[in-house]
Amino acid sequence: LRSRGLGDVYKRQQVADIKIESNIFVPKYMNIDYGDMGVLFGNLLDNAIEANQGVDRKKRWINVSVKYEEHILIINIKNSKIRGSRRKKKGYLNHGIGLNSVKQIVEKFNGIVEVQDFGEMYEVSAILYGICDDKDLGKSVL
């Protein structure tokens, strides 16, 4: 279970020389715990950075898209990877717990997580339902 700050993820991305593009359109306030958001994005971005490790430095990239539409939060992260690779962390007893943590958080909002391997690209999509924005906080939206 990773709950490191996104600043740590940013530092890892810089050291790994990965180009990141992001399109993030969300309200300032939402009914998602900050700790859950840290675990959600920390794990997804850590996985994307890890998948880039074997890729030629000039071909490393991550694309992050997050948008909010009518009580739905849509997260999409795509990243480069080596075709056919399925990295395993040597000596890491809890490998795989990160994505399970992501799924648990998404399930709190009756959402879904989908992971797809397109050869030289991974894509992870998560949809969370019943998200309140700053105009709706305190109201039931389900």
Language model region names:
Residues L1-Y10:
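Single conserved hydrophobic/aromatic residue that forms the stacking wall/gate
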Residues K59-H71:
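Short beta-strand/loop element within the Bergerat-fold HATPase_c
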